[in-house]
Curated annotation (Swiss-Prot):
It comes from Mus musculus (Mouse). InterPro entries: CCDC90-like. Interacts with MCU. Keywords: Coiled coil, Membrane, Mitochondrion, Transit peptide, Transmembrane, Transmembrane helix. Belongs to the CCDC90 family. GO terms for cellular component: mitochondrial membrane; mitochondrion. The keyword Membrane applies. It is a single-pass membrane protein. Residues 1-42 form a transit peptide. This is Coiled-coil domain-containing protein 90B, mitochondrial. Pfam families: CCDC90-like.
Length: 256
């Protein structure tokens, strides 16, 4: 069954995939490029272990029997050997790809052991870090806590001192304002008394002046009355004198 499938797949009449043979039974570089793959390394430390060396890897089919089967189906010996060489090379490339992309159970166990060793190393480093760095951090935190407590105490003392100073200043200012208000009140009372005294004196002077003015007005009225009488008397005497003179001239004129 296997020989018939290979015959249908590799027959030279074009019914299957056409293969190009190369000398010495090797694949061309263009054909090899399609089967080459790249693998990436892990980030952790790993010791490369090759469980199955290349010389110990065996093919899964009998190449001699396959050559004979191909010869019985119309291939000559050179073509049969070339086809078997190509199949062998393809199998080796496939095995290389499988061994590069996959691991065996033994490789997995070795990798797990390496990972566990790496984790143990990390755990030891963490313990050392906890004993050293964490202790230093704890000491630094305690030191900072003590410094913060000291700063807090200093701030409390400074706040209390400032509050006491402000309270004293407020009391002094209140006393000063009270004294100033008392002095102003005393000065206001004295000014009020002085104003009342001045007002009384002014009223007394005004009253005396008014009395003097009334007296002067009365005396002026009396003087005016007396002057009026004197004037009337003078005018009457003047009139009588003028009449007497006029009568004298009249008599004198009549007699002449």
């Amino acid at each position: 069954m296997r020989s018939r499938w290979i015959w249908r797949f590799l027959r030279p009449d074009g019914g299957g995939i056409r293969w190009t043979s190369t000398p010495h039974g090797r694949l061309s570089p263009a054909l090899r490029r399609g089967f080459l793959t790249t693998t990436t390394k892990s980030d952790y430390d790993r010791r490369p272990v090759d469980i199955t060396p290349l010389e110990q890897r065996k093919l899964t089919f009998d190449t001699h029997a396959l050559v004979q089967d191909l010869e019985t189906h119309g291939f000559d010996k050179t073509q049969a050997q070339t086809i078997v060489s190509v199949l062998s090379t393809l199998s080796n490339v496939s095995l290389d790809t499988i061994y590069k992309e996959m691991v065996t159970k033994a490789q997995q166990e070795i990798t797990v052991q390496q990972l566990m060793a790496h984790l143990d190393s990390i755990r030891k480093d963490m313990v050392i870090l906890e004993k050293s760095e964490f202790a230093n951090l704890r000491a630094e935190n305690e030191k900072m806590k003590i410094e913060l407590d000291q700063v807090k105490q200093q701030l409390t003392n400074e706040t209390s001192r400032i509050r006491a100073d402000n309270k004293l200043d407020i009391n002094l200012e209140r006393s000063r304002v009270t004294d100033m208000f008392t002095d102003q009140e005393k000065q206001l009372i004295e000014a009020t008394n002085e104003f009342a005294k001045k007002d009384t004196q002014t009223k007394s002077i005004i009253s005396e002046t008014s009395n003097k003015i009334d007296t002067e007005i009365a005396s002026l009225k009396t003087l005016m009355e007396s002057s009026k009488l004197e004037t009337i008397r003078y005018l009457a005497a003047s009139v009588f004198t003028c009449l007497a003179i006029a009568l004298g001239f009249y008599r004198f004129w009549k007699e002449n």
